[in-house]
Amino acid sequence: MISKRRRLDSEDKENLTEDASKTMPLSKLAKKSHNSHEVEENGSVFVKLLKASGLTLKTGENQNQLGVDQVIFQRKLFQALRKHPAYPKVIEEFVNGLESYTEDSESLRNCLLSCERLQDEEASMGTFYSKSLIKLLLGIDILQPAIIKMLFEKVPQFLFESENRDGINMARLIINQLKWLDRIVDGKDLTAQMMQLISVAPVNLQHDFITSLPEILGDSQHANVGKELGELLVQNTSLTVPILDVFSSLRLDPNFLSKIRQLVMGKLSSVRLEDFPVIVKFLLHSVTDTTSLEVIAELRENLNVQQFILPSRIQASQSKLKSKGLASSSGNQENSDKDCIVLVFDVIKSAIRYEKTISEAWFKAIERIESAAEHKALDVVMLLIIYSTSTQTKKGVEKLLRNKIQSDCIQEQLLDSAFSTHYLVLKDICPSILLLAQTLFHSQDQRIILFGSLLYKYAFKFFDTYCQQEVVGALVTHVCSGTEAEVDTALDVLLELIVLNASAMRLNAAFVKGILDYLENMSPQQIRKIFCILSTLAFSQQPGTSNHIQDDMHLVIRKQLSSTVFKYKLIGIIGAVTMAGIMAEDRSVPSNSSQRSANVSSEQRTQVTSLLQLVHSCTEHSPWASSLYYDEFANLIQERKLAPKTLEWVGQTIFNDFQDAFVVDFCAAPEGDFPFPVKALYGLEEYSTQDGIVINLLPLFYQECAKDASRATSQESSQRSMSSLCLASHFRLLRLCVARQHDGNLDEIDGLLDCPLFLPDLEPGEKLESMSAKDRSLMCSLTFLTFNWFREVVNAFCQQTSPEMKGKVLSRLKDLVELQGILEKYLAVIPDYVPPFASVDLDTLDMMPRSSSAVAAKNRNKGKTGGKKQKADSNKASCSDTLLTEDTSECDMAPSGRSHVDKESTGKEGKTFVSLQNYRAFFRELDIEVFSILHSGLVTKFILDTEMHTEATEVVQLGPAELLFLLEDLSQKLENMLTAPFAKRICCFKNKGRQNIGFSHLHQRSVQDIVHCVVQLLTPMCNHLENIHNFFQCLGAEHLSADDKARATAQEQHTMACCYQKLLQVLHALFAWKGFTHQSKHRLLHSALEVLSNRLKQMEQDQPLEELVSQSFSYLQNFHHSVPSFQCGLYLLRLLMALLEKSAVPNQKKEKLASLAKQLLCRAWPHGEKEKNPTFNDHLHDVLYIYLEHTDNVLKAIEEITGVGVPELVSAPKDAASSTFPTLTRHTFVIFFRVMMAELEKTVKGLQAGTAADSQQVHEEKLLYWNMAVRDFSILLNLMKVFDSYPVLHVCLKYGRRFVEAFLKQCMPLLDFSFRKHREDVLSLLQTLQLNTRLLHHLCGHSKIRQDTRLTKHVPLLKKSLELLVCRVKAMLVLNNCREAFWLGTLKNRDLQGEEIISQDPSSSESNAEDSEDGVTSHVSRNRATEDGEDEASDEQKDQDSDESDDSSS
C-alpha cells in the first residue's frame, strides 16, 4: 500500500486508469451484492468521477460504499478533476451534480453519514473509521469553497425541523462536516458564514454551533470570531455559557479577554446557577500573573452560591405545593442546585491544584480583608480547600487563620454558614479539616483552640459516620494529651456532640470509655465532664441494648471509693455524684404503660439512693472526703438534677445530721476544759436563757483536736463522727435542699442566720504578744472557721426578700470585714501556720496538710515551693485537718519548714503584714448571687450615724469596707472567668489548678451566665461609682471646711480609692470580654451599654450600637476628674479602650482618649506612687503607650516631651520632676525613653514610601514628615549623653538599628525620586541623619570600651545596618548623577562624650579600613558587595580593630 501511494503521487492519468482497473474486481463484488441499490450514472460527471475514484453511491438507507483508502480516493478524485478536459468548468458541473443529487433528503443524509468500507480494505488499513462523502470532498481544496457554500445553503431548511426518528438532526449533521478539516481554503468566508448562521439559528442549535467553532475554524480566525462572539455576548445573554466555553479554547488577546471578563463579572450576580461552572472556569482560565489577584478578588465578591440554596429551602418549607408532582420537581431542583455547586467548586479546586497563581491570588484576596463584616462563608471554604491541596500551603493557611481568629474577623457564625451551605464540598476534604483542627488545638490562644473545636463540631454534625468516628477519636486523643486547654475544650466539644447527636455518639462510646484510664491527671471540673459524658451515654441507652458502659462505670467508681489513696477517693466521689445526677434526670423510658413507667422510675430512684448511700458510707469517717461529698452533692441539687422524691429522702437526713452535730440550745452550757472563756458571740438577736440556738463551734473543734492527739498512733475508729471542718459544706448542702424543696424560701432554717456561735473572744487586742504558739494557732483556726461559716451564711440568705433578713445579711457582711482584720493580726505573728481547709478538691490537694511521715519524706526529697503547704503544728488549725492516707489518720506535730505566706513584707518596726489573697484556698467561695447585695446604697461617714441601728424599719446600707470586700471578690471572679485564657500562660498538669483555686463553684457556671449576672449589677455599680466620684470631688472642693475634711480620714480615703479602682476593674473585665464579638451575645452587650448610656441621659429603646458606645464613652470619661490614683486612671483608660473596640469608628474618640492619658501624665500624684515603684512604672509605661498610640501626631507628642519635659527634668534638682510632666523623673526617664523610641520606630515603619507617580505635594508632605521623625530621633539619641545608664544605651542600640532599617526601606525610595526636585531638603535630611549615625557609631565604640556583653551583642547588626545605609545613600546619589556629593573621610573612634578611644593594638592602625562618618565600616573603594550583607563573625572581627574611619555624604 505504501508503494501504491508513492506511485499515485508520481504518475499521471494512465497510471490512474491502471489503478482503477485493479479495483474492478472489488466493484464487481459490490455489484453482485448491492446492484439493486446502486445509483446509475445517467451521464452525470459527479457519479462517474466518484465511481472512477472508488466510491459508489447508494440509494435508500444503504451507506455509500468506499472501495479504496480515503486518502487514495481524495487524490484520485483531485487528479481526475484537474486533468479533466473541461477543467475548471468540470468543478462547477461536479458540484451541481452533487447539489442535484442531495436535493433528496435521503441522499443528502447518506452523503453526510460515514461511508461503508469493504472488508478487504478495512483489513488492509487496520482502522474502522470512515468519513462521509461530504467530509471527503471537503478535504479536496478545489472543491471545498463550493461545497461549503452549498452546505450553508442547505442548512436553513433544516434549522427548525425536529430530529428524525433515528435521532439525527440534519442541521447539526451538516455543520459537523466542517469540523477538524485538515485545511481551510477561505477561513474568513467560513467565519462570516458561520456567524451569519448562528445569528439566525434557534437557541438550541446556537449553543451547538458556537461550541463547534474551535473545531471548525483555524487559529488565524480566532481573533475575528472572538470579536464577533463578544458582540453577540452583549446582545444575547442567553448565549453566555457556550460563548465563554468557546473563549477558553480560542487564542485571544489578553486585553480583549479582560474586557470580556469585566462584562461577565458585571452579570455574575444575575446568572443561573447551572451556568456558574462554565463561567467560573472561563474566569479562572483567563487570568494572568498580573491580573490574578484583581480577578479573584472580584470573583470572590460576586460569587454567592449561598443564595441558590437557602432561599430554596425556605421557600419549599413555607409554600404549599398543590401536588406531589410539584413537590417532586422542587426536590429535584434542589438536588440539581447542589450538584451545580459541587461542580463550581470542582472547577475551583482543579484550578487551585494546578495553577499556583490562582491559589496565591485566593490566599491574598482573603488575607487583605480586615473586617469581620467583609468576610463571607466562601472565604472559609476556600481556605479549607487551599489547605487540602498541597503541603506547601498548609503553614500559610494556618498562620492566616490564626491572625483572622485573633482579630475576630472569622467567627463562629461564619464557620457555621460555611458548613451548612457547602457541606457537600467540604465532605470530600474531611481529613484535611480534621488535620487543621488538630493543629489549631495545639495553640496557646484559647480563641484559636475554640475555632479548632468548632471544626470538629461541624465535621461531626454534617459529615458521614466514618468522619464522625474520626472526630471522636481525635477528641479523645486531645483529652488524653495532658495539655489543660486541649483537655477542657475537647471535653466541652464531646458534651456538645452528645446534645447534637446522641445516637451517633453512642456508636462511638467505646472510644470515649478509654478516657477512664487517664483520670489521675485530670482536674475536678474535667473529671465531672468525663463522668457526665460517660453517664449520659450509658444511661441514655434504649431498653434491650447492652449496658456494658454502666457496668464499667460502676466498677471504676466502687474501686476508687474504696481506695485508701485519698486522691482516688476524691475522684470516686466526684464521679459517683455526677453519675447520680445523670441517672436522676434520665427520662428516656417507654410510655406504653404508665405502670411500667412508674416501676422504672422507682428502680432509678433506688439506684440513685443506693449509690449516694455508698458514697456516704465511704466518706463519713474522713472530714476531707465528707466535705467534698457535701459540696458535690450541693452542686447537684443546685443544678436541679435530683428527682423530688430522692431529694425528699436526702433533705430530711441532712437536716437531722446537721442539727445533731452542730446545733445546741442557747441555754446549754459548753462542757469541757477550754483554754479560753467560751461565750455566745456574733448573735444578732437578744436571746433569753430559755430559747434560741447556738452553733457549737469551739467545744466541737477542741474535742476533735483532743481526739486526734489521743489516737495519733492508733487505727482510725469506725465510730461515726461529724467534724467541725464540715460545718460550712454541710450547711451549704442543707440550705440548698431546703431552698429546692420550698422554692427558695429559707424560713425553715432562718434561725441559723442570726444565731451566735460558742467562741472565745476572737479579738486578740494587747494579749496577742503574750499568747503561746498553741493558743495563737487555736484562735486563728477558730477565726477561720467562723469566717467561712459567715461566708456560707451570706451565700445562703443573700437573696431573701424580707427587709429584716436583708439587714441581717448586711450585718454578717460587716462581721466578715471585722474578721478579716482579726485574721491579718493572727497571721502576722504565726508565720508557719496552715489554716483548716475550707473546700476539698484535686486542685487544692497539694496545698493541704499531710501526715508526718509524708511530710518528712517530701521535705527530704523535694525542695520547698511557695505554693505547697506542709503539715503544721498540731496545736494549730491542722490538729483537725486530718487526711486519710493509706489506712491511718494522725495529727502531725512537726511544723512545716515554710510559711504559707509567699508575699509578705516587714515594716520598719518588724511587724509582718499579710495579704489574705494568699489564703484564698482556705476561704469558702462566695456565690455570684451574693453580689446582689450591691443594690444596697453606699453611705459614707459624712452621713453615717447610729440612727440606722435604732430605726427598725430602715434598711442597713452598705459601707465602704463592705463594698470593697464584695468588689475584691467580684473582681477576682471576673478576672478568672472573663480574662482571655491566652493571656494566662497555659501550664502543664503539675500546676494546672493554681489559678482556679477558690473558684470551683464558679467554674460550674457558664461564662454567659456570669456576664448576665454582672450586667444586672451595672446599675448599682454605677451608683457606687458616682457616689465615690462625688466623695473625691467634695474633698477637692475649696468651700469644704477643715472640720469636714478632717472627718474624711486617710483610711477612709484609701478604702474609697480602692473601691473606685475595683469598680473600674470590674467594668473593664466586663466590657473587655471577647465573647461580646459573637452574634449571639450582641443583645447582652446592648443591655450593658444601655445601662451606661441611660446614666447620662434617658435613651430610647433599640438604639444603634454606635450611639450606645458613644454615650457610654461620654459617661465614663467624666470620671477622669476624680480619679484618686494613677492606677485608677489607667483602669479608666483601659475601660474606655474596651468600649472603643466595640465601635465601628473608633478614630472619633481616639484623640479624646489621648487627651485623658496626657492629663494623667501631666498630673502630680502622691509621693508614694512613683519613687522606684515597679508597679507604678508598669502603669506609667501603659499610660504613656496609650497616649502615643492614640494621639493624632506621634512625632509632635514625642517632640513635646523631649523638648519641654526632659529639659525641665535636666535643670531640676536631683529628686525633682518635670513641671509639665510631673510623672517624668530621673527614675521614670527610662520608661519614657523606651516607649518614645519604640513608638517612633513603629511610626516610621508604617510610613509608605510612595511612588514617583505621586503628586509633588505628596512628596513634600512625606519629606516633611521624615524630617520631623529624624529630628525626634536626633533629640532622643542625644539624651544618652546625659542619661548614660545601661537601659538607655540598650534602647538606643536596639531601636537605633530598627530606625535605620526603616529609613532604608521606607525613606530611601522616596529620596530616590525626590532628590532632583527637592535637592536641598534631601541633603539637609541626610546631614541630620549623618549626625545621628555618627552618635550610633560612637555608641558602638563606647559599648566596646565598657565591655558589657548585653550591649556589645547589638553592635554587629547595628554596624551592618549603618554600612548598608552608606552604600544606599551613595547609590541614590549616583542614580541622580550627583557623585560629587559623596566623599570618604577618616574619623577616629570616640566615646559618647567625644573623647578619642585609644587603640589597644598599635599594629591594627596600619591595616584599618575606612569608615563612614556615620560610624559604619565601609569598603566602598574596594567594591565590597555590602548589599549581600555580612555575617556576625566578620562584624565582631571588625569590632576588634582599634581604628575605624568614616564615609560621609554631604
UniProtKB/Swiss-Prot annotation:
Pfam families recorded: FancD2 (PF14631)
Biased composition (Acidic residues): 1441-1450
Post-translational modifications: Monoubiquitinated on Lys-559 during S phase and upon genotoxic stress by FANCL in complex with E2 ligases UBE2T or UBE2W. Deubiquitinated by USP1 as cells enter G2/M, or once DNA repair is completed. Monoubiquitination requires the joint intervention of the FANC core complex, including FANCA, FANCB, FANCC, FANCE, FANCF, FANCG, and FANCM, and proteins involved in cell cycle checkpoints and DNA repair, including RPA1, ATR, CHEK1 and BRCA1, and is mediated by FANCL/PHF9. Monoubiquitination prevents DNA release from the FANCI-FANCD2 complex. Phosphorylated on several sites including Ser-220 and Ser-1399 in response to genotoxic stress by ATM and/or ATR.
Modification sites for Phosphoserine: 220, 714, 1255, 1404, 1412, 1434
Domain of life of the native organism: Eukaryota
Chain residue numbers at which the record places covalent cross-link Glycyl lysine isopeptide (Lys-Gly) (interchain with G-Cter in ubiquitin): 559
GO BP, sorted A to Z: brain morphogenesis; cellular response to oxidative stress; DNA damage response; DNA repair; gamete generation; homologous chromosome pairing at meiosis; neuronal stem cell population maintenance; regulation of CD40 signaling pathway
Residues with Phosphothreonine modification: 1426
UniProt entry keywords in alphabetical sequence: Cell cycle, Developmental protein, DNA damage, DNA repair, Isopeptide bond, Nucleus, Phosphoprotein, Ubl conjugation
Composition-biased stretches (Basic and acidic residues): 8-21
Location within or outside the cell: Nucleus
Primary location class: nucleus
Annotated spans, Interaction with BRCA2: 246-357
Interaction with FANCE: region residues: 1-289
Annotated knockout phenotype: Mice display delayed pre- and postnatal development, defects in germ-cell development, and increase incidence of microphthalmia and tumors of epithelial cell origin.
Gene Ontology, cellular component aspect: condensed chromosome; cytosol; DNA repair complex; nuclear body; nucleolus; nucleus
InterPro entries membership: FANCD2
A molecular-function term among this protein's GO annotations: DNA polymerase binding
Stretches the record annotates as Disordered: 1-37, 853-879, 1398-1450
Bias (Basic residues) ranges: 859-869
Recorded family membership: Belongs to the Fanconi anemia protein FANCD2 family.
Biological function: Required for maintenance of chromosomal stability. Promotes accurate and efficient pairing of homologs during meiosis. Involved in the repair of DNA double-strand breaks, both by homologous recombination and single-strand annealing. The FANCI-FANCD2 complex binds and scans double-stranded DNA (dsDNA) for DNA damage; this complex stalls at DNA junctions between double-stranded DNA and single-stranded DNA. May participate in S phase and G2 phase checkpoint activation upon DNA damage.
Self-association and partners: Homodimer; cannot be ubiquitinated and does not bind DNA. Part of a FANCI-FANCD2 heterodimeric complex that binds and scans dsDNA for DNA damage. Interacts directly with FANCE and FANCI. Interacts with USP1 and MEN1. The ubiquitinated form specifically interacts with BRCA1 and BLM. Both the nonubiquitinated and the monoubiquitinated forms interact with BRCA2; this interaction is mediated by phosphorylated FANCG and the complex also includes XCCR3. The ubiquitinated form specifically interacts with MTMR15/FAN1 (via UBZ-type zinc finger), leading to recruit MTMR15/FAN1 to sites of DNA damage.
Protein name: Fanconi anemia group D2 protein homolog
The organism of origin for this protein: Mus musculus (Mouse)
Underlying gene: Fancd2
